[in-house]
A protein has these predicted regions:
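N-terminal intrinsically disordered, cationic/polar leader segments
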Residues: 1-180
């Protein structure tokens, strides 16, 4: 038995094939536009993130020269308190205690790690591709260092810088959520 296709069925199948081709072309066009839009958005987000990275570098550069004076001021305050509280303690012991306090509040290491993380953010953004998860991790690391900087700081200036950093990190984190 052989199947017979009527002229109307044949016309319907041709029309259906034509519609399928149109749908496929529209889907491809929409997909191409989506990819192009995401690429443009990714470039803009990358630029925004890099601007904040540069602002954070500026903040680190502002904080670094303040460290020696902040530590010296802190040591002097601690020395005065210790002398007042324990006039009977020997001067060498006070210097040792002050050294311990100074190492607890020294934030140079945090500033160095911030710079390293900022370098990595810039490298990852420049690399392109699917970088969202990597950037999210780096935002966590930056936030951790900024928190440590704020908590260890004995200077209101350095604390204010750490707060500014945290705001920039939060802005970057919001943008990173939009990156694949």
């Amino acid at each position: 038995m052989q199947w017979q296709i009527s002229d109307s069925e044949r016309a319907y199948l041709r029309e259906l094939a034509k519609k399928q081709a149109e749908c496929a072309a529209l889907a491809k066009s929409a997909l191409d536009e989506l990819i192009a839009t995401r690429a443009r958005e990714g470039e803009k987000l990358g630029t925004m993130i890099l601007e904040r990275v540069e602002r954070m570098r500026t903040l680190v550069a502002e904080a670094a020269p303040k460290l020696p004076q902040a530590l010296a001021d802190y040591q002097e305050r601690m020395a005065t308190r210790l002398r007042e509280a324990a006039a009977s303690l020997d001067e060498e012991r006070i210097r040792q205690e002050m050294g311990l306090f100074a190492t607890r509040v020294d934030v140079a290491e945090e500033l160095n790690r911030l710079v390293a993380h900022l370098d990595e953010v810039a490298r990852v953004v420049g690399k392109g591709g699917a970088i969202g998860k990597r950037l999210d991790f780096l935002m966590q690391e930056l936030n951790r260092e900024a928190n440590t900087l704020a908590s260890k700081s004995v200077s209101t200036e350095i604390t204010a810088i750490a707060v500014d950093m945290k705001l920039l990190i939060e802005q970057m984190r919001e943008q990173v959520q939009n990156i694949e």
